[in-house]
Amino acid sequence: MTYEKNIPNATAKRLSLYYRIFKRFHRENIVKTSSKQIAEAIGIDPATVRRDFSYFGELGRRGFGYDVSKLMTFFAELLNDNATTKVALVGVGNIGRALLHYRFQERNRMQLVMAFDTDDNELVGSQTEDNIPIYGISQIKDKIAQEDIKTAILTVPSVKAQEVAELLVDAGIEGILCFSPVNLNLPRHVVLQYVDLTSELQTLLYFMKEEEKARRNND
């Protein structure tokens, strides 16, 4: 199946939602579905579903809809969920510790296999309840190379984010999910995604305010 490589960011961010919905439909023994049903399950409009899917060629057939099993397999391959992806975590502060206890593998094929923090951190040398080892930052290059890890989660203070990100790239990391509220300057081949909790909360509050305005206008 051929499809456009440069899909919009908004569409890319919905891919995991589509995959989750098709897995749910499959568990519920639903054989085929429609853009309307998909849209209702996600909370968007059917036109958005059809537009998103159009970037990937003919995913459905007019008059039939979408084959659930076929689309579940398609999105699994698209999101590389047919093979286990090893992930390293750098920074075991509040966010990092929470992520260490998040059971990634129960929901998909991602596996958090190791964590790092400053060499003098009291947690260095220990393991989590799930047997995830915590190493000192000085071991980052050797340990990541041993496990051939290409993906990392970065949850360090902003002032250290650039320095640590460069260490990760030198160690062979090709994709970073960054929780630090700072723009990283890294080689073009490194894929970056940012999670800004403050920004997300502000966006939530904005939509709550707009919803309140709409209710008042309808009263």
Curated annotation (Swiss-Prot):
UniProt main location, coarse: cytoplasm
Gene name of this polypeptide: rex
Family: Belongs to the transcriptional regulatory Rex family.
NCBIfam families: PRK05472.1-1, PRK05472.1-3, PRK05472.1-5, PRK05472.2-3, PRK05472.2-4, PRK05472.2-5
Organism: Streptococcus thermophilus (strain ATCC BAA-491 / LMD-9)
Primary role: Modulates transcription in response to changes in cellular NADH/NAD(+) redox state.
One Pfam family recorded for the sequence: Put_DNA-bind_N
Entry protein name: Redox-sensing transcriptional repressor Rex
Keywords carried by this UniProt record: Cytoplasm, DNA-binding, NAD, Repressor, Transcription, Transcription regulation
Location relative to the cell: Cytoplasm
Any one GO cellular component localisation term in the record: cytoplasm
One Gene Ontology term from the biological process aspect of the record: negative regulation of DNA-templated transcription
Classification via InterPro entries: CoA-bd, NAD(P)-bd_dom_sf, Rex_DNA-bd_C_dom, Tscrpt_rep_Rex, WH-like_DNA-bd_sf, WH_DNA-bd_sf
